[in-house]
């Protein structure tokens, strides 16, 4: 089964009217957050964070700084290494009822050295559309700062 058949798309459709689901079920958004400077966040991530029904955050104490900085009032819940199995079940149930969930970590992309993979696994198994919203990436930043040839 290829990625498209599993319901994964690198880029989802976000309209002026809000986050758009194609299945009637909700949707899972993996939202990349800045890796150092809050202003490195993308407009698209900001829009999804504002329009999602709930934000699942690795550490709500850190994430509240990001949300407050951009005046985002979306309800937030914790989703971290120590609750990822149980919380994934709760979040999947919400998405099956039509809610959209945006996942953020302290810095970077959910699922890359951060919680996210279990929620993605359960969402896909439940037929929920999963979208990854790109942003700052430590590996690209390190490569461009290295002076190494990239061609």
Name each model-derived stretch:
Residues 2-82:
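Glycine-rich, flexible N-terminal cofactor/catalytic loop recognition
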Residues 26-28, 98-102:
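Loop/turn-to-beta-strand initiation segments
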Residues 35-38, 106-110:
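Short glycine-rich anion-binding loops that position phosphate/pyrophosphate groups of nucleotides
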Residues 58, 79, 104-106, 131-133:
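Structural motif
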Residues 61-63, 108-109, 138:
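Alpha-helix capping/helix-boundary segments
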Residues 83, 107-115:
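Acidic, metal-coordinating catalytic cores used for nucleic-acid/nucleotide bond scission
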Residues 83-91:
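Glycine-rich, highly charged phosphate/nucleotide-binding loops
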Residues 118-151:
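Class I SAM-dependent methyltransferase SAM-binding "motif I" and its flanking Rossmann-like core
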